[in-house]
């Protein structure tokens, strides 16, 4: 009997020991595992707020089944399908939410000059509109403005310059708020074309217009969220983006992107001295260059995998947008036509052709893509009242508006962070 009790006591002690061990293990593991009733936290999708400017100058876009309506419907449908809580409002001197705005599925079907008559539609204060929108833009909010984006001031004295300066100040405050909230800020400016049937306002003069007119879609918010939005909406490619999309430009407070051997390769294929470049194992830096003394110059090229940059191809192919140092290196051409084996893993590589003048070699070159207002903005802008319809692709003072936004970002960046990207290539030896 005593022997049986002893055995039972040993078993009981063993069970207690196991239970204590398990409990101890649970306590120790609390730092690595969530309690059973705790759900894994995921980053929430932002809320998308779409603002349609409804001043009288916008009426001409909605009198027919225009590309404007098609693009707006495309924008609303895709945003509402991907983001929960998508909200649509009219905006002019204030923000107005009508019952029509709640019916996202049928909003465009019901859109016409009469249904847009809410608030003060007699004039446009684009700076006030920007301020109202940016005051409602936070880390988890993507704001989208659809507007013809015209300053309602004449270029008399310093009025237009003052309006652009006000735009700069409004966006600088938004950038500062974003940084205070520990994130970077971004703005995307897209120009779209649409049929227009109505009055075009050249200052206070109403001019009948039946033809194509530009308007703008401007996306503002957290850089990461805006980048994702552009990807989900397929805005990188003009063919899959908004109907009527003609130009796009993205600017952010993010520091300069440093390219490396995963985004750039050096090659000399299709050049007369192709065999004389021996690339390093990384495919970018050069282990050895054999110099032909009979050649006065040395030609080579860089293949860049930068197609995901949110910019028009025309911007990426404009060699005036690039800068190279030291001065003996010159850019002779930028194109997307050359096909090289070295760049097969790049999607739509950009080829930057270069020359070293007079065999005056340097051990390192630095290539930069400058961040500046694209040429299309100037081409699509006029700033003096004409008294008649402008060219179909032109908007009044759109350059001043974009320059105002650009200046806000430019002034908020360090001097060495104002390029879109920078690339350094080392030449280790010559013979």
What positions do the PLM features span?
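Acidic, polar low-complexity linker/tail segments
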Residues: 2-49, 56-62, 421-431
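Extracytoplasmic/secreted cell-surface and envelope-processing proteins
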Residues: 58-63, 96-102, 151-161, 196-201, ...
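Well-ordered, non-membrane alpha-helical segments in soluble/globular domains
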Residues: 64-75, 113-131, 158-179
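A charged, solvent-exposed segment within the mature domains of Sec-exported extracytoplasmic proteins
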Residues: 133-206
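Eukaryote-biased recognition of electropositive, low-complexity segments
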Residues: 178-301
